[in-house]
């Protein structure tokens, strides 16, 4: 999980003013008791939800990159995440499952989860987030292969538009050894196990 330090940003005051204006434009009284601190709360929330822009996922992996001869699949599954859809700025959330096959180097397991957190803490589309996670691991560790599967519920589909509350979107991307159907199948079987 990303650290929960207090958000201090030069953008905070501007964001507060813009959110105050939005509340007024929606027809509400931004000065009434229940809404007085809402612009600041929302501004801080948005800065937290997008703090991935200020973090380097490659550096996170490099900070715990270890030489190791292990050459079988490493899977970190059921990584919970929240993100914001870049089209409506509504949340989407779910689980990421990430595997790689080392090629002389491994990384700390928590670093895989941190990479997911960094890319999910940006305005995103699920497809690009899946690709970014895969590319970051491939570029930094140079493994024999990487596979990422992301399953998510999108509030932009549940609260508005088609209003399909039970829909789940699944995306996947892979490189190297995962181009082989047998390797992909092994990964899929392993992430389905509970």
UniProtKB/Swiss-Prot annotation:
Disulfide bonds, paired cysteine numbers: none
Record GO terms (molecular function): GTP binding; GTP cyclohydrolase I activity; zinc ion binding
Keyword terms of this UniProt record: GTP-binding, Hydrolase, Metal-binding, Nucleotide-binding, One-carbon metabolism, Zinc
Reactions accelerated catalytically: GTP + H2O = 7,8-dihydroneopterin 3'-triphosphate + formate + H(+)
EC number: 3.5.4.16
Enzyme class: hydrolase
Pfam families, alphabetized: GTP_cyclohydroI
GO annotation terms (biological process): one-carbon metabolic process; tetrahydrobiopterin biosynthetic process; tetrahydrofolate biosynthetic process
Pathway: Cofactor biosynthesis; 7,8-dihydroneopterin triphosphate biosynthesis; 7,8-dihydroneopterin triphosphate from GTP: step 1/1
Alphabetized Gene3D superfamilies for the sequence: 1.10.286.10, 3.30.1130.10
The keyword Lipoprotein belongs to this UniProt entry's keyword annotation: no
GO cellular component: cytoplasm
Annotated InterPro entries: GTP-CH-I_C/QueF, GTP-CH-I_N, GTP_CycHdrlase_I, GTP_CycHdrlase_I_CS, GTP_CycHdrlase_I_dom
Binding site for Zn(2+): 85, 88, 156
Annotated family: Belongs to the GTP cyclohydrolase I family.
Assembly information from the UniProt record: Toroid-shaped homodecamer, composed of two pentamers of five dimers.
The name this protein goes by in its record: GTP cyclohydrolase 1
